[in-house]
Amino acid sequence: MSDAPLLGSAVPPDPLVCNGAALRKATRRVSQLYDTVLAPCGLKVSQHSILVHIARAGSPSMTDLARAMVLDRSALAHNLKPLQRDGYVHMMRDPLDGRSRRVELTETGRAKLAESRRLWKDAQNRFEAAYGVERAAALRHALADIFSDEFALAFSRG
């Protein structure tokens, strides 16, 4: 008997067999757990991550920030709206290229990032306590390979 799936089968494939489904499921679970820990500061882990990326880059262009976060620009713009509304980030025209926009943290945003970092560290510690420090480090390395440009290129080549 063959292990090949039956085309048109009404039974969906096991999500643990599909790499994409397994990664999405794990991402949702980890996001839920981190969001719970970050809730007292009013941020979700996705918002915390955006603030971290902006802080590291200074005042990145939208294109550079989207690339660093592996997001398309429209998704980034959508995710920036609540951060801008709450006064954590400021959008401005690039002085060297008026067609491009840059984003930077406000003072309020820097304070919110400092507050969320403490909670994020707690979430990190909880993850490593539950999953194991060495396994967590190995997981981060494996995931870094997967979200690299080199992996995307190799994948697109088939």
Please identify what each model-predicted range represents.
Residues 1-41:
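N-terminal leader segment of winged-helix/HTH proteins
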Residues 12, 151-158:
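Short, charged, intrinsically disordered terminal tails
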Residues 31, 59, 81-145:
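Charged, amphipathic alpha-helical coiled-coil/dimerization segments
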Residues 40-41, 54-57:
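Short helix-capping/hinge SLiMs at alpha-helix to coil transitions
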Residues 41-47, 75, 106, 131-133:
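Short helix-coil-helix linker/hinge
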Residues 50-51:
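Short alpha-helical "packing" element that flanks the helix-turn-helix/winged-helix DNA-binding module
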Residues 57-60, 71:
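The short coil/loop that forms the "turn" connecting the two helices of the helix-turn-helix
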Residues 66:
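The alpha-helix within a helix-turn-helix
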